[in-house]
């Protein structure tokens, strides 16, 4: 099995990290049902070895970053916090693009303030084109240039991308050094196979979201049968498959439950045989 660490920016991080999206209220909007539980989950994540947390100030909005600060500040030196800009929330909880220079600059400063930081470790430009639900072609030069300028000002250490096409990745790499790409990818949704391999060749991290499908979890009898045969959960198998898919894949499964967090972290110890991997590879063709 590949190494359990990978370099993100200038730090080595454990490949099984934590996504903070579910720490906000229902629909990633408003406060959590129990703030104490959210704080406990974050502290337990670090106790279990997590040193890569994915967040955004548009989760809540503001909520997850404020909880992260309350739970973990002052931050340990080995912790990498990755955030995203490029979207905002409407009063009705809708997800809206926020791509103007002023909106991008405000988002960086909102993240800094709510996390209690002077500089952000990694900022992903979250691209919302087309219907906003998946990557769509279109130039990101203007928006990325704004983010690169904030990097030059010392507000951002490293830059990443989210919800992008291969063409946009190539465009971005001509403007700034890109340390990670965050797209939807899982055992059933494998449109980025070629991108993952190309990024791995260049030492760039790939961070899949929705590891078991989007807000409607993947229903696969094959996955369920494999999980049962291994004495594992479908999510654990899906995470283990991703870890073995490529050494540059960093995982950020999210949860608001300590028990579920521990289940997710146990996936790191689950080794899938070549026979099992071959069976699971067939899910994308079902």
Name each region found by the language model:
Residues 78-91:
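A short, structured active-site edge motif that brings together acidic residues
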Residues 10, 47, 69-80, 113-116, ...:
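Acidic (Asp/Glu)-rich catalytic clusters
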Residues 128-286:
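Beta/alpha (TIM)-barrel catalytic core signal, keyed to glycine-rich beta->alpha loops juxtaposed to Asp/Glu
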Residues 1-79, 285:
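N-terminal binding-site loop/beta-alpha segment at the start of enzyme catalytic domains
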Residues 50, 117-120, 156, 178:
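A structural motif
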Residues 31-45, 99-115, 165-170:
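Short, acidic/polar
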